Amino acid sequence: MEFGRLITAMVTPFNDRLEVDYVRAAELANHLVNTGSDGIVVAGTTGESPTLTKDEKIRLFSTVVDAVGDRASVIAGTGSYDTEATIELSRKAKEAGVDGLLLVGPYYNKPPQEGYYQHFAAVAKAVPLPIMLYNIPGRTGSNIIPATVARLMAFDNIVAIKEAAGSMDQVSEVVRLARPDFKVYSGDDSLTLPILSVGGHGIVSVASHLVGKEIQKMIAACINGNISEAARIHRELYPLFKGLFITSNPICVKAALNLLGRPVGGVRLPLVEANDQEVAAMRQLIESYGLDASCQETVA
């Protein structure tokens, strides 16, 4: 399964009562495909997975699958700190028709490396879907080291990793150890080009809600050998990449989408709405990049 090079970690739209707005979720998924996304992660960190119920996640999986059809891959965020619960939700995601699974490293209980291995191995054995591992020690509290990732490559359906440790040394080692068909994705927009330069495959992006086509151009320039053009686009987009993370994600990207007239609602506690300074910062970014609600949308 080829997930694509630009995958958007989609926000979960809520209505004024902070209920999931499935109509707007379908609309947003279509918008993302029309603005350059090859794939969509549903109910990941950016989708506020910790505050979504199991039933909400399953319905979101089906909603996005139905919305995008075969125009993009749909990857379900089903990982948790409970192996059996992860397997159960992953099976439901398969029934919903998703193309793959995003499995975050178990958080809070901080397993040793053998625990990470056995957790991911159990899911890979139980659910015959392509799996993207997700390493984000800044959120989980523990790092999945490259040697553990290499062990997990023995499972044919573990096909990729979203690497968000923020370490180019770690990415370089994972790429060095990877089997030929194993894909390494950046988990940070600002590190997309550096990770591509050492053999990474793509990005699981937040900024692609706003500048998907420009990110696609940067990726294409890099893989086609036009490094100077890729670097130019990277430099141009860098303030946006960083600006969307001046507070906890997805607070800012939701604020930006709302300002652009593409309503996605607020965030669920314990996250809080963007404050006045953060809203002002998003407004300034929108104006400086000349963004509007279409975000350069092209209807297929």
Swiss-Prot record:
Q: Provide any one GO MF term from the record.
A: 4-hydroxy-tetrahydrodipicolinate synthase activity
Q: What class of enzyme is it?
A: lyase
UniProt subcellular location: Cytoplasm
Q: Which CDD domains match?
A: DHDPS
Keyword line = Amino-acid biosynthesis, Cytoplasm, Diaminopimelate biosynthesis, Lyase, Lysine biosynthesis, Schiff base
Q: What pathway, per the record?
A: Amino-acid biosynthesis; L-lysine biosynthesis via DAP pathway; (S)-tetrahydrodipicolinate from L-aspartate: step 3/4
One Gene Ontology cellular component term attached to this UniProt record is: cytosol
> Which PROSITE patterns does the entry link to?
DHDPS_1, DHDPS_2
User: What's the name of the protein?
Assistant: 4-hydroxy-tetrahydrodipicolinate synthase
User: Taxonomy-wise, where does this protein's organism fall, top ranks first?
Assistant: Bacteria, Bacillati, Bacillota, Clostridia, Eubacteriales
Q: Which gene encodes it?
A: dapA
